[in-house]
Swiss-Prot record:
This is Ribosome modulation factor. During stationary phase, converts 70S ribosomes to an inactive dimeric form (100S ribosomes). It is found in: Cytoplasm. It comes from Saccharophagus degradans (strain 2-40 / ATCC 43961 / DSM 17024). The keyword Transcription regulation does not apply.
Length: 68
């Protein structure tokens, strides 16, 4: 059975979350405008917050799988 691709907004959120957790700058957002950029930035903000709150790698992986 074929798996459906996730929509672009959830993929952008996940990528933004990963960037935030890794401590990268939000200026590295690959999207220029629109809903996809907002999703990436929202993920980035949540990732930075989790990074600051001291989530370990396992907790971050669990959070990403719960979001997706």
């Amino acid at each position: 059975m074929k798996r459906q691709k996730r929509d672009h907004t959830s993929r952008a959120f996940t990528r933004g979350y990963q960037a935030g957790v890794e401590g990268r700058s939000r200026s590295l957002c690959p999207h220029s405008t629109g809903e996809i950029k907002q999703s990436w930035l929202t993920g980035w903000r949540e990732g930075r917050e989790d990074h600051w709150n001291g989530f370990n790698t396992l907790a971050q992986v669990q959070r990403i799988s719960n979001i997706s």
